[in-house]
Amino acid sequence: MKCISLKQPYAEMLAVGKKIIECRKWCTKFRGDFLIHASKNVDIKSCNYYNIDENSIIKGAIIGKANLYDVKKYLNYKDFLLDANKHLSIGIPDDKTIYVFLIKDAAKLEQMIPYKGKLGFFDVNLY
């Protein structure tokens, strides 16, 4: 199964369905179900902004699953701002073109699975 790694707290917010758009600098042709991996790296500014204790969140593990059903492209900063309540990013993108992965059917796993993350979508065989 495909998997994508996100920094915390964004991995958690995606897994519980609060975050329904994932912004990336690259496009993908992949569509379908995927696993959500929480990176060992934490975005401290975002944790502070969302009042999340960085020590209370899972790191370095697969924590959820979701479905990527479409990809669209932001051509300017205005597009990015209009969807702020969906991607929950607090930073300003440094690229003029941002690809946004539209996500649905997110769910946390009952038990986390320790796993080393990688860049981009990567294959995971849990069996």
Regions found by a protein language model. Give the residues of each.
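Structured alpha/beta reader/binder surfaces that contact nucleic acids or chromatin modification marks
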Residues: M1-Y127
